[in-house]
From Swiss-Prot:
GO terms for biological process: adenylate cyclase-activating G protein-coupled receptor signaling pathway; adenylate cyclase-modulating G protein-coupled receptor signaling pathway; cell surface receptor signaling pathway; intracellular calcium ion homeostasis; locomotion; locomotion involved in locomotory behavior; locomotory exploration behavior; male mating behavior. Its main location: membrane. Residues 193-205, 273-292, 355-377, 425-546 are extracellular. Residues 1-171, 227-251, 314-333, 399-403 are cytoplasmic. Changing G298D: In bx142; reduced mate searching behavior. Pfam families: 7tm_2, HRM. One of its GO terms (molecular function) is G protein-coupled peptide receptor activity. GO terms for cellular component: plasma membrane. Keywords: Cell membrane, G-protein coupled receptor, Glycoprotein, Membrane, Receptor, Transducer, Transmembrane, Transmembrane helix. Expression was observed in the mechanosensory neuron pairs PLM, ALM, FLP, OLQD, and OLQV, the chemosensory neurons PHA, PHB, RMEV, the ring motor neurons RMED, and the pharyngeal interneuron pair I1. Expression in sensory neurons PHA, PQR and URY are responsible for mate searching behavior. Expressed in AIY, RIM, RIA, and other neurons. This is Calcitonin receptor-like protein 1. The chain crosses the membrane at residues 172-192, 206-226, 252-272, 293-313, 334-354, 378-398, 404-424. The lineage of its organism: Eukaryota, Metazoa, Ecdysozoa, Nematoda, Chromadorea.
Amino acid sequence: MADATSPFNVSILDNSTKLSEMVESGWNVLASTSVQAFNEAMDVLEESYPLCKKMLDHNNLFPERDPNDTRIWCNATYDTVLCWPPTPANSSVTLQCPHMKGLDPNKNITKDCHVSGVWSGRNAGEMGPTLPGWTNFTMCYTDEVIYIMQNLNNESLTIAQEVARNARKLEFVGLGLSLVSLILAISIFSYFRRLRVFRNLLHLHLMIAMLMVVILRLVLYIDLIFTGENGPHTNSAEGKTINTMPIVCEGMFFFLEYFKTVTFCWMFLEGIYLNNQIVFGFFNSEPKLLPYFIAGYGIPLVHTMLWLLVVLIKKDFKVERCLGSYYLEPEFWILDGPRMAELVINLFFICNVIRVLYSKVRESNNTSEAGLKKSVKAAMMLLPLLGVPNIMQTIPFAPTRDNIMVFAVWTYTASFTYMYQGLMVASIYCFTNKEVNHVLKTFYARYRLLHKSQNELRRGSRSVASHYAAKNGTANASAPQTNNADEFGKLSPFPSRSKKGSDDSTTKLMKDAVMEEEKNANNNGYGSAGEMTPLREGSNRSTKSP
């Protein structure tokens, strides 16, 4: 376990997004000090030096030394990250750390100019008039990178990096499946009026919040990939990706935390509603949605804005890039504390619902295994809804050289249970819901019937048109009219003695389908308040049985 100051003392929920970035950035920063990275950096120095001079001019630093100064100087140089101004020999120059993954821009970094007038290197081979010397970026390391250096050796760091990459792939698949399933479920609940009962509207808003979290995470993940492809030395002022856009990046993370809080809040409202319906029977009629709507979206907004205000006040309203490592700050408990409380209360709701359902089965003297399984199954449907997978996400777990394999299993399990939560919720409350399946089957049957009926009507219309065309053509002909009836009898598919009216078999089928639909529909268009969920149906059946 991590101590209170450990950068890994953060929920795996955020590790699923941040762990790979932290480990990969730490790995890249550590690797940037290698000889291979040094040799690769030399290839771009020649073309980067003009840019370095422009940067020095922009910062009011002299790119060239004073020709009247007879002292020995180190020339201005560019180490592919920072541009260093001319510096007198046997002295040093200090600059602010760059905005890069794994580096803290609030720290400073110092570069030494050797007494011989060349930039100091780690050894004599890295010193020369045309060489940039060695920049010791360990001065800029963030707490995460320092933690990695102190607690992970090369082998465990490699494993942690592999775990982070595999977890990212697992999350991509889970987020993609959740995205598709949530869009389908939301579309179904929104399209069919019979499904717009109160309990389904709660499910609908819960899935909307989950969908927004999924979309924001996918956008940030994809942006992180593009940021990495642009290279770690991309000029942050260019704003090519979200990660390099100051206001946009902070806004994305703010809305991510907001919709995460909205998800927790709608989970909590679902728990309150179901607990009151099953345990207390508060609502003889369905409650109004407006108070739930205000609470589900308004309270999280106030909650998230309060957290952001506290963070800004602490930092004197100087916002860090992408809000920095906000998930490591103690102020993050302003968000995580109430979320944890909602999860604990919802777990109590689950246990209480199971207890009530079990007692109702016993009181009804129906102790059959099938009845008990049905009640427990209905209660277990609440598990993904009320956020049990999130409990695993909120338990801090730190990787060290001693528990790296346990950490790998923990990370994979936590990533799977959270990132696939949207898929599980959509499956349980939509795709496997008998009521939804019945509505979809009815819709498909009516669609097939309508399609078949239209084809039959079109075929009938063509036959009637052929009949009249044949009749008119015969009447206008100059040939004798004695065989008109015989010719008509050969051309017409219908008996000449009778015609079917509008109430033929096809029309009757259409009327039956429409009457059946009108019979099942509610007058106000929002479904019946007394419709039974599997949960309520099992509860009421147990109560009414002798």
